[in-house]
Amino acid sequence: MNKTRCCVDVAFTLLIHRHVNMSFAIAAPTRATFHTQVKSRASPRTRVGCTAGLFDGFGRGGSKKAKDDVLRLAETQRRGVGHSPEDRAEMEAAVDALIASRGKGGRANTDRNVLTADWRLAWTSENETLFLLEKFPGGVDGAPLTQAYQRIDVESGTLSNEVVFCNGTDFVVNSVIEVVDDVRVSFQFTAAALNLAEPVEASVPLPPFGRGWFDNVYVDKDMRVARDSRGDTLVVVRD
């Protein structure tokens, strides 16, 4: 597939799905539809599991074995792409074990120095992100893999979700965030754009998609696990 065709396909697909909430694991609580508005309701902090990793060597903080198990599953399950209910259950169990085993270094934390970072997706249960990773995987003929990132700056109160496709095109959803307590972060989308790479070189603005919250249920120096207002789980590693 040449660059022009890849750009056009990405643009077409994202425009068709522009009402899809593309924030890996931070979307409105209602899962049956992808509407902008969020119905007000109680938001219990239920644990719906997730995982982590894509690279070896992240073994400090909390139980090394529990963390390694999460990272291994994340890699085996290809970041969650095409995962089965059984895969999800296995990952959830591994994450629960990680949370239960966490030591002082793996406590949930929204501290600025801990949360502020560029985080690369290791595993997610969030369907919209997985759709993009499956539709445009990259990694063919020497091309890089499509990657997803969460870029957080607590001091400036911003969060950016970004999917970078194999040809350099990226899809970005920007949000403002507020730290609610030592675990929970609320967010509201402010803007979204599809930035096409060469030879198209164009930016297609898209509407923002609502608001929600996520809980950081595990954080250490190189990995973070979050569970959100839609019941999804996200595992990211520090980039």
Q: What annotation goes with each model-predicted range?
A:
Residues 6-7, 50, 166:
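Generic recognition of cysteine residues
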Residues 53-239:
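Soluble ligand-binding/transfer domains with enclosed cavities or grooves
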Residues 18, 46-48, 115, 220:
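Generic detector of short, well-ordered, non-transmembrane alpha-helical segments enriched
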Residues 22-28, 47-60:
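N-terminal mitochondrial targeting presequences
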Residues 1-42:
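N-terminal chloroplast transit peptides
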Residues 39-48, 89-93:
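A short, compositionally biased N-terminal segment around positions ~18-40 that is enriched
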